[in-house]
Amino acid sequence: MNKQVEANLSMIVSKALGGFNMNALKYLLPLWIAPVTGVTFRLVFGAAAFWLIDIFCKPEDSTTRQRWQLFLLGALGMYGYMFFYLLGISMTTPVSSSIFVSLEPIWVFVITVLFYKEKVTWMKLLGIGLGLGGAILCIATQPGDDLASNAMAGNLICLVSSIVYAIYLVVSNRLLKGVGDMTLLKYTFLGAAVMSLIVNSIYGFEAPIMSMSLFSTPMLVLLFVLIFPTTISYL
């Protein structure tokens, strides 16, 4: 298969899983899992999965310094993104949260312009203006409903999560270009998982879903979130 076609198909699958993920998380949060506990579930599962998968992969070279950088990047960037994302989606609607996720490329561009002197064109500025305008309109007009307990706060938190993830993407790309993909996943998820366990120990573990049977609807939805959006979409 042509590499470009393969890349496009991978992107389509990843975005589709992301869309299903938003609706699945909205179903689970906060009724079946508290947002902080949900973050811990995802990151611990993801870290365990990537370390297990790496056993069957070709070894990748990395220095101790790079591994520590990845660990800290995961503890701050990956965990920060996941924490704000799940907290935000528990308050707003899947449609609104998806709008803010789609703004990540805008924040990446803004960060690279401010800190890495990326070239600015009028077309790029127009695109940023349209994207931000749509987001502001969404925040200003989002009404409360059965799916959104606090739409305004949820939208703003999702906005913060998209900015945090953009920072994570820029830093990981600029500082760690020589690191293999599996090494990146292993150590960023490990750092994020450790941070999630620390935070969860402070706030407390809250997951009524653990009293459900394995084949109950909430548990099957959780397994989907853990296996597909959390693990497969990153590979």
What are the functions of these language-model segments?
Residues L28, G38, G88, L114-Y116, ...:
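Hydrophobic/aromatic residues within transmembrane alpha-helices
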Residues P30-G80, W107, V164-V171, L185-E206:
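Transmembrane alpha-helices of multi-pass small-molecule transport proteins
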